[in-house]
Structure formats: C-alpha cells, structure tokens
C-alpha cells in the first residue's frame, strides 16, 4: 500500500508509514510542491496511492474525484507532531485492511469517521 503525503504533512510521518511496512512519498519527492488539490488527487491515482492530508478542502472535492480517490484527512489543532505520529500509527494498525476502495476518512485525537464511497 502506498501513501502520498500532502505538503502540509510533516516529513516525519513518512517514516511512521514506512516503519509500518508501507510505501510513502511526498509532493517534494516529485518536485510538485504548490500544486492544486485536483492535481494531488491525479498524482495519487496515477501512483495507486492514498492521500494523507491536514487540509479539509480534500473533503469537498468534486464528486468525480471523490469517487475515485482514497483520502485520509487528519483534523488536529494545534498540529502537534507527536500527537500526529500517534494518530497515523494507530490508523495504520486499525484500517490497513479496509483501504482498497474509494473512501474518505477523518481522524482526530479521539474520533474517526470512515466513509466508503
């Protein structure tokens, strides 16, 4: 399983994902910083990757992109890197078998909302 980290996700999360046995890459790896969310989705689709983001705008993509994409949105304020690592680690252990089809998933410190599409 592959994950594409949106540019707002700390690079340290890449290691958390890799330590759990999954592939992870960033927009920086593709030299594509600053691209629009639709292009991030296209990049993820072309690489069969799940988008991991802190940007709630990904929850409001047009319907066509939503039906194709796999998005994990992490709602965390303030953005504490230690808490973020714990949330991602817990998510990977809990959801890794459910991530094959299109979905939106919102994670917080205390709650999860999984929406298959």
Where in this protein do the model-derived segments appear?
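Ribonuclease/tRNase effector modules and their secretory precursors
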Residues: 18-19, 89-94
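Small/polar loops that bind or transfer phosphate-bearing groups
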Residues: 5, 53-54, 76
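Acidic, metal-binding active-site segment of PIN/NYN-like and related structure-specific nucleases
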Residues: 44-62
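Mid-chain, well-packed structural core segment of small domains
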Residues: 59-91
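Hydrophobic/aromatic beta-strand patches that form the interior of the parallel beta-sheet core
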Residues: 25, 52, 72-74, 105-106
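Charged phosphate-binding loop/patch that engages nucleotide di/tri-phosphates or the phosphate backbone
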Residues: 95-117
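N-terminal first-folded block
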Residues: 3-47
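Metal-dependent nucleic-acid phosphoesterase active-site entry motif
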Residues: 2-11, 109-111, 115-117
């Amino acid at each position: 399983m592959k994950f594409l980290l949106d540019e707002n996700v700390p690079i340290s999360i890449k290691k958390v994902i890799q330590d759990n046995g999954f592939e992870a890459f960033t927009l920086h790896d593709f030299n594509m910083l600053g691209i629009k969310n639709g292009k991030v989705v296209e990049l993820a689709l072309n690489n069969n990757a799940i988008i991991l983001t802190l940007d709630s705008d990904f929850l409001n993509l047009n319907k066509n992109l939503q039906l194709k994409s796999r998005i994990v949105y992490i709602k965390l304020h303030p953005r504490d890197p230690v808490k973020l690592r714990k949330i991602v680690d817990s998510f990977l252990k809990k959801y890794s078998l459910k991530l094959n089809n299109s979905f939106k998933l919102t994670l917080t410190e205390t709650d999860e909302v999984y929406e298959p599409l």
